[in-house]
Amino acid sequence: MSDSALQVPAPAGMTPPSAPPPNGPLQVLLGSLTNLRRPPSPSSEPAGSADEPAFLSAAKLHAATAAFLLSGAAVGPAEARACWHPLLEQLCALHRAHGLPETALLAENLPGLLVHRMAVALPETPEAAFREMDVIKDTVLAITGSDTTHALEAAGLRTTAALGPVRVRQCAVEWIDRWRTVTQSCLAMNPRTSLEALGEMSLKMSPVPLGQPGANLTTPAYSLLFPSPIVQEGLRFLALVSNWVTLFSAHLQRIDDAALTPLTRALFTLALVDDYLTTPDRGAVVPPPLLAQFQHTVREIDPAIMIPPLEATKMVRSREEVRVSTALSRVSPRSACAPPGTLMARVRTDAAVFDPDVPFLSASALAIFRPAVTGLLQLGEPPSAGAQQRLLALLQQTWALVQNSNSPSVVINTLTDAGFTPAHCTQYISALEGFLVAGVPARTPPGHGLSEIQQLFGCIALAGANVFGLAREYGHYAGYVKTFRRIQGASEHTHGRLCEAVGLSGGVLSQTLARIMGPAVPTEHLASLRRTLVGEFETAERRFSAGQPSLLRETALIWLDVYGQTHWDLTPTTPATPLSALLPVGPPSHAPSVHLAAATKIRFPALEGIHPNVLADPGFVPYVLALVVGDALRATCNAAYLPRPIEFALRVLAWARDFGLGYLPTVEGHRTKLGALITLLEPATRAGVGPTMQMADNIEQLLRELYVIARGAVEQLRPAVQLPPPQPPEVGSSLLLISMYALAARGVLQELAERADPLVRQLEDAIVLLRLHMRTLAAFFECRFESDGHRLYAVVADAHERLGPWRPEAMGDAVSQYCGMYHDAKRALVASLAGLRSVVTETTAHLGVCDELAAQVSHEGNVLAVVRREIHGFLAIVSGIHARASKLMSGDQVPGFCYMSQFLARWRRLSAGYQAARAATGPERVAEFVQELHDTWKGLQTERALVVARFASSADQRTAAIQEVMAHATEDAPPSPAADLVVLTNRHDLGAWGDYSLGPLGQPTVVPDSVDLSPQGLAATLSMDWLLINELLQVTDGVFRASAFRPSAGPGAPGDLEAQDAGGSTPEPTTPGPQDTQARAPSTRPAGRETVPWPNTPVEDDEMTPQETPPVHP
């Protein structure tokens, strides 16, 4: 029927907009309502038939509205703007024509119902998100403007309904404006996104509890709009922004905490920069106040925590230690690595830093020292008793608080205060997995091998990593439910071996996460919206149908129940009519023949054709359930999980859901189950969207529940009516289930393969590097090393020239650096093995599920069997790779690493003994060092006496190995011959510069071997009292003035100037002369005072020529 044939006038002021998008939910509703507009029944019709047009119109209106409310597709802003005015025009016209409560309620509450169906997708960038929200706000203003209120008033309808234009405009616009204000305030606190925050960030930011910024946006005042995509998407975006502020503010409290030691505060600052202020594109963004605070903190750190550069070059470095050492040495939190060739101090990372008598770290935040903790966890060596006591006290207290708290903010603050930041938790997990992979379980029973300290670190790090991962998206919105389910489900599989070793397997970690970070259930919001909808229906029913129930009431409540069930996992609270209560009691309202006649009229897709009195008869309910639900069940089970078959199944399910609405009661929640099934199957109509295993399980459960309802209805009709019972939805008999499970299983396999591919590549790269390093080291240690007493030479073969020389410390540093490269490759191998083991564990569990599903299918060659074979083949490949790669980590030593480890162990023992002997004041340390030398020499002689299978390497390979290991070490050049030295004389005729060579002024200084440049020698030199420039000038001036009457040499001749030790007193220098020569004679010096002759005292001696002057090294 065209619009020109309608006799109902359109309201004034309605102008049709541009053509709306085709096939949208609002466009479909508009088309359905357009076909409903017809003139009222003529008064000449017989009595009793005048109600039929109104009934048919109400049924069609109800069907169209139900399709709109229960549709899985969303309404875009463009569709809403294009269809709004024509749709409102049609509703007002229908209401003037029929005066139905359905038309009144739908027209009055259409703005709110449309807002609940509006599509919203906010981009990740704030500017784009604000622009998108402005579009939504303009759309809300357009559908709730004056044209809408005038149209409703002209039709005699309310504008102040709960979901009407006035309330929706006020509530939605106020919510959007408040959301924008809160979001902008959170963005202003982020130095990464705000230039103002970068320059004006205060170190005194108050902590922001998790979820607090969005608390005012989820108050009961917004309950009517809470399920809408506008609110849900806005809360999701706000959660991403505000949760960063929460984590950042919790960490910020520690960087200037006066109760912490300076080193602890500096380490918290570095962790803050790494976790929250470093971006891939801009690097570290450090606000000026934070930089100034860090510089002030570093100046207060005890220098004893740093190892001098000359000693640091002999030690193996790690990436974490280099990060801390570089930042502390360069006094900048931006510094992460030292430039090549830089000589820099090194921070101590030994277990002794945790000792109670060492005041470097605060006892309440020992876990903040990342390089020291990583080394402690990787090596597994127990620290001292005092350090163990401090660590256990902190770890036990932290783990107890994490276990016994159900507040996310309390747990986050507890983890952060103890030093378990997001990056630290990840690093500690990697360190412990490396320790487990290194062969510890091979020597100990399964599940053991970790010390108590390691177990506590593992428990806290595992819980902390998952808590911080959830905290980034935590919020009161439906999307967080999926995030929580995903992270919770993968928490014990991702690090399965470590979870088992620390006792968090078997659901312990999942339960801990559920207690702390479980999503909040919006029970009150949904209950408030339900009460509001019921109230609106009751109002419309009293006004237009004398209190009779509206056909749309159940539809609206089903829509709300389906939303709660599919988005929040909430079971509907409305009690459904049990099937047993529908058994006929007393005389039936209609004869069985009437029921049979009406049942024969049930045809898909017709919703009318049966008289309302028959539909409302309880005796007719089993017929509808057996036929309608049974047909829907058969159509769905026989549809393959492909777009076209699922589209047809969805139409049958929608017909079964809407059949008899308003007259036929909902039995065992069958309409809610049908609606949930439609929502779950709707993504299958879009190409490229595959099912998940969880979705397949939910759909199978709903099909089984519908089968119970249909089977019960068939049993009620017997023996009067014999209907074939529906086939139970089994995997072996349902095309939908077998195809859906097969696609879901293959989707899981694809995800596992995508995870395994980079891990295998990383594993391959690490193994190649390890092989190269091992071969190089094996060839390196096949060489013979000779010494001339001060330097080392490498001899690759008897007939080859010696390579070198190098100083011993230079060679030790080169080997240590090469070992560092080896350890980097080893860490990459450990991380890859841990990730690959997680893939193997998940694949094994997935294969078990597929085996159970495939066992339900009798015929061979089915699609599930094919997928199962693919999974089995993938598991065999990944398991084989993991098993072969794990052999490199088995045993006490990695193959090819034995000689290098022996060399490093001996080098460390000799170096420690040598340093102790030099710093000792008694003979005990010297004797211990001599004994260590003796033991080392005996060990070398014993090894040389054994016949050991040597790695067959050529002289060229050994030469290449020496060049590779010693590539960055500078050869120690021999001393320059005397001909290359420039001779300095004592000639000082300032008027004859042409007779002298100015070459010495441009020559570099050569430090003679007699000068001690060791840390002890430099410390002794720097501790002396030095002559000031003015004192030196006074002495030299006195010498020049006394040169005219030089005294003869004798007992009173002036002696050398002396440099006194620290703590001595230097006498005020005076002009030397005959009257005070006794005061400066050598015999008057205090005993034990060491003197230093001054070689440059000018003395006039014309008889001495430059050629006769002895050479002096500048």
From Swiss-Prot:
For region Disordered, the annotated ranges are 1-51, 1046-1114
A GO CC annotation given for this chain: host cell Golgi apparatus
GO terms for biological process? virion assembly
Instruction: Provide the alphabetized UniProt keywords.
Output: Host cytoplasm, Host Golgi apparatus, Host nucleus, Virion, Virion tegument
Q: Does the keyword ATP-binding apply?
A: no
Intervals of motif Nuclear export signal: 263-272
Principal cellular location given in the protein's record: virion
Q: Where is this protein found?
A: Virion tegument; Host cytoplasm; Host nucleus; Host Golgi apparatus, Host trans-Golgi network
Region Interaction with large tegument protein: start-end pairs: 568-1114
So which domain of life are we looking at? Viruses
The record's listing under Pfam families reads: Herpes_UL37_1 (PF03970)
Known InterPro entries for this protein?
Answer: Herpes_UL37, HSV_ITP
Q: What does the sequence similarity comment in the record state about its family?
A: Belongs to the herpesviridae inner tegument protein family.
Complex and partners: Interacts (via C-terminus) with the large tegument protein/LTP (via N-terminus).
Q: What does this protein do?
A: Plays an essential role in cytoplasmic secondary envelopment during viral egress. Interacts with the capsid via the large tegument protein/LTP and participates in its transport to the host trans-Golgi network (TGN) where secondary envelopment occurs. Modulates tegumentation and capsid accumulation at the viral assembly complex.
UniProt protein name:
Inner tegument protein
Q: Which organism is it from?
A: Human herpesvirus 2 (strain HG52)
Gene that specifies this protein: UL37
